[in-house]
Amino acid sequence: MDLEQLAQATADTFNDRSYRDKAKDMMDPDVLIVDKPTNQEMRGPDAYVQYSDGFVKAIPDLRGTVIENKQSGNKVSSRVRGQGHFTGTMVTPQGSVPGNGNPVEIEYEIEQEFNDAGKVVRFVIDYDMQDFMRQLGAA
């Protein structure tokens, strides 16, 4: 697989929820996960699963559609449109926010850096936190 296909596989495994089983195969054991809006950093495939689970628990039908990929060296930046309904619970540092059924549609950017073995060594996600929280009805 080329790097854009590997980047697409990350989105595909999120969408079909197989990321829980495949994260260790797709990611380096020391992968760095960065949520830019919150400055949260985590390490390892298990942290990626926990991070992804947070969004799935809040928006169980959340799916991401890759709009565009740009490759530069061993990095792929993907522009993604996420859509779903806030029917679960979003856990934040300020406490839990219960779902209200609101539709959510947000564009976000994911930058993935790959090693020579095709494993993700760095996964950075960036999105408009204010818009996201507004759509949830939490802002």
Regions found by a protein language model. Give the residues of each.
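C-terminal and inter-domain tail/linker signature
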Residues: 1-139
